């Protein structure tokens, strides 16, 4: 049943509150607030009893989909189960009751956590130093690009181009543009990896860096990464890694060892902080020795048994946000790493890779794989066969999956795959869950052949049915007051 808006539940005179009688003299508002600031009409607030308000929001919460309810297969999002011990440590009063402006003598535990987390992240990725300030992945990207820009500026090298592989996240060129760079696209080859000849043809004296994701967005490891790093560095450019897919690399290999100069982590993804509702995120940036002087300040340093914040050197790019990053996410990531240890982190990536390849092997029965396997932690199928043969688009398949009780995967991304259906099962899903999910997608493929209208009209069991997306894209009014 469709849940009405809270305003539709409103009835004149109903109240969900009880206030004590006013114990001060009442005065006309006009006598204390300028008339120009007063409303001309009464504010339109819903009048609803307390029990109806509670029931309304409980019903809405039951409609919500989240990783505690079922598998969340969004590709390139790493929607893994978030251990509840992370929330327990985050709620400890020694962390939750702190204020960032307290004297550092009273926040030694928090500073120790930040110091140790920075060191652990640096070790995991093979970097020389880490800043915890960036608030999300794209914010980390921007920070990394500004570090690259500072590196070249200090050398008097006025480079104005950034190379971005065509399978990259959309935030890569957006972050580059925000930092003032011209973005040049590098093609993928027939195997879905970086085309070295196209890269070579675009490397010139104006190129500040190449932005790369490894594994890339279709789940393939860039096997020629060492050669790519050599080509980029020989050009005087730097190599940036988007850490969106670090869940495939933990304990197996390190970006710093591959030749990357700078990267960002997504703590909310790889290190298990809830982000299905939009955040908060955390996108720390790791750098090698050549970029250390430019890291955002403040950083935490240890002197004897005491921790303190530094103001950064003369070449630091300065603050990237107020205070010290999204601290609650840092606590969760620290807990996750300490709970698992080095061996546990490696098992995370191994199991993520196993799950992705197992699920892929089942789905190849009816879906096309545009690039060769094996894959790493995720894969990208194509719905071209269903579209050409039966008029069923990837969008239809994704909508129909809702009727089977699953959140849809990422669709129509990356752009190099036609009718893309990108799936990342993560390491936390069992074989039984993967089997049920695979059976659902295979059933939808059969429906596309035998009764395509069922798929085209989906979803049919959700509270909100298929939206008129064409009208929504043309009429952009989203709120009526």
UniProtKB/Swiss-Prot annotation:
The keyword Repeat does not apply. It catalyses: N(6)-[(R)-lipoyl]-L-lysyl-[glycine-cleavage complex H protein] + glycine + H(+) = N(6)-[(R)-S(8)-aminomethyldihydrolipoyl]-L-lysyl-[glycine-cleavage complex H protein] + CO2. One of its GO terms (biological process) is glycine decarboxylation via glycine cleavage system. Its cofactor is pyridoxal 5'-phosphate. Keywords: Oxidoreductase, Pyridoxal phosphate. It is an enzyme of class 1 (oxidoreductase). It comes from the Bacteria. InterPro entries: Aminotrans_V_dom, GcvPB, GDC-P_C, GDC_P, PyrdxlP-dep_Trfase, PyrdxlP-dep_Trfase_major, PyrdxlP-dep_Trfase_small. Its EC number is 1.4.4.2. The modification N6-(pyridoxal phosphate)lysine is found at residue 269. The glycine cleavage system catalyzes the degradation of glycine. The P protein binds the alpha-amino group of glycine through its pyridoxal phosphate cofactor; CO(2) is released and the remaining methylamine moiety is then transferred to the lipoamide cofactor of the H protein. The glycine cleavage system is composed of four proteins: P, T, L and H. In this organism, the P 'protein' is a heterodimer of two subunits. NCBIfam families: PRK04366.1. PANTHER family: GLYCINE DEHYDROGENASE (DECARBOXYLATING), MITOCHONDRIAL (PTHR11773:SF1), GLYCINE DEHYDROGENASE, DECARBOXYLATING (PTHR11773). This is Probable glycine dehydrogenase (decarboxylating) subunit 2. It comes from Chlorobium chlorochromatii (strain CaD3).
């Amino acid at each position: 049943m469709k849940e009405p808006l809270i305003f539709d539940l409103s009835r004149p005179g109903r109240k969900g509150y009880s206030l004590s009688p006013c114990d001060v003299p009442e005065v006309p508002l006009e006598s204390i607030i300028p008339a120009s600031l007063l409303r001309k009409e009464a504010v339109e607030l819903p009048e609803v009893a307390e029990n109806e308000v509670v029931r309304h929001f409980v019903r809405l919460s039951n409609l919500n989909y989240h990783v505690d309810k079922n598998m969340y297969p969004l590709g390139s999002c790493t929607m893994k189960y978030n251990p509840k011990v992370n929330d327990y440590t985050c709620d400890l009063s020694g962390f939750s009751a702190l204020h960032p402006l307290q004297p550092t003598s009273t926040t030694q535990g928090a500073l120790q956590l930040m110091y140790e987390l920075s060191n652990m992240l640096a070790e995991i990725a093979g970097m020389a130093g880490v800043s915890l300030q960036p608030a999300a992945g794209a914010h980390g990207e921007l920070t990394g690009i500004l570090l690259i820009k500072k590196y070249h500026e200090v050398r008097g090298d006025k480079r104005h181009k950034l190379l971005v592989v065509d399978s990259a996240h959309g935030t890569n060129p957006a972050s580059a543009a925000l930092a003032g760079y011209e973005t040049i696209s590098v093609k993928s080859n027939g195997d879905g990896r970086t085309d070295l000849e196209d890269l070579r043809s675009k490397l010139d004296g104006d190129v500040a860096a190449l932005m790369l994701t490894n594994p890339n967005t279709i789940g393939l490891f860039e096997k020629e990464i060492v050669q790519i790093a050599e080509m980029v560095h020989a050009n005087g450019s730097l190599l940036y890694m988007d850490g969106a897919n670090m869940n495939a690399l933990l304990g197996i290999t390190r970006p710093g060892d591959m030749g990357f100069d700078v990267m960002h982590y997504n703590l909310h993804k790889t290190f298990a902080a809830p982000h299905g509702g939009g955040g908060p995120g955390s996108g720390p940036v790791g750098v090698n020795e050549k970029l250390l002087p430019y890291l955002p300040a403040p950083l935490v340093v240890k002197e004897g048994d005491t921790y303190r914040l530094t103001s950064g050197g003369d070449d630091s790019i300065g603050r990237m946000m107020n205070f010290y990053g999204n601290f609650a996410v840092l606590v969760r990531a620290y807990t996750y790493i300490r709970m698992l240890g080095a061996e546990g982190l490696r098992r995370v990536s191994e199991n993520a890779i196993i799950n992705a390849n197992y699920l892929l092997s089942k789905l190849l029965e009816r879906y096309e794989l545009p690039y060769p396997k094996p894959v790493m932690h995720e894969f990208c199928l194509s719905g071209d066969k269903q579209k050409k043969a039966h008029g069923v688009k990837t969008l239809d398949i994704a909508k129909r999956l809702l009727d089977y009780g699953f959140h849809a995967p990422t669709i129509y991304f990356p752009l190099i795959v036609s009718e893309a259906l990108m799936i990342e099962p993560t390491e936390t899903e069992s074989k039984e869950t993967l089997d049920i999910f695979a059976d659902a997608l295979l059933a939808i493929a059969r429906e596309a052949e035998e009764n395509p209208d069922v798929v085209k009209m989906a979803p049919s069991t959700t509270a909100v049915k298929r939206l008129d997306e064409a009208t929504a894209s043309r009429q952009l009014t989203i709120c009526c007051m």
